[in-house]
Amino acid sequence: MVTRTCRFIVILSVCFAASASFAAQKSFDKRFNVQPGGHLTLDTDVGSVSIVGRDTREVVIHADMSDSDHLDVAAEQNSSGVTVTGRVTGRSWLDRLDLTSMRVRFTIDVPRDFPVQIQTSGGSLDVRNLTASVSGKTSGGGITLQDVIGSIRAQTSGGGISAARLNGATELRTSGGSIDIVDSTGDLDVRTSGGSIDLNSVEGKVKAVTSGGSVHAAVRVNRGVFLTTSGGTITLLLPERVRASIDAQTSGGRAQSQLPLSSTELAERTHLRGALNGGGEQIFLRTSGGSINVRPMS
């Protein structure tokens, strides 16, 4: 009798464990056939988001969710495209301040020419392989952008930003991390309050501002460069034959150029001003906490 009772308890425990696991983990899936001209809008209270452009005319939505009894995910098609929402329900306002126990990840495939608008309060953003505009905002994670041909506006309050192979005007903001960009052919406007900025192989007009780190920029074509930092060095790499008018000044180090400048003004080795190859678009460099180095691009 005791043996049978023990077996019953074990079986009952397994059933409860399986039931609890099922309740704590579930998924959401939906797909829509779409026409050119629409866009994707995603607005969620919590969750990381990954969006990939495909050679298709479908929007395919998949979400993996933990502790999802308190998250209501919905997706609908309308005249402007597809809208996806994720809303936390059934929790007190105090519980809503801490959503770390809710692990949610959205994975969405869209047509390559489908513009996307993303907003999440609790996760990272990853967007790849689009020939359309991107707008993204997160309060709690990093941002990754790759192979985007179109304008970009993205900001995060809690992570770094990494981007590669961009072709379009790009505006990036972060309050808590570094910004790294490789291979960009559009205008760049980037700003961080808490990290370094690294721009490699970029074209277009460049504006980069940081309050808490160094700035490194390798610029292939000079269409105007504006680099400032309050807490680090500035290193600018330029082609030897580029035309530029350079104005570089530091309050905490030396300003120097390994490229020959004409009409050079040097004030106590902290202020460097001159024309490169006869002059051209202005290059403005300022730092309060480090040296400035202008070097030839190898």
Question: What kind of region is each of these model predictions?
Answer:
Residues M1-S298:
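Intrinsically disordered, low-complexity terminal regions
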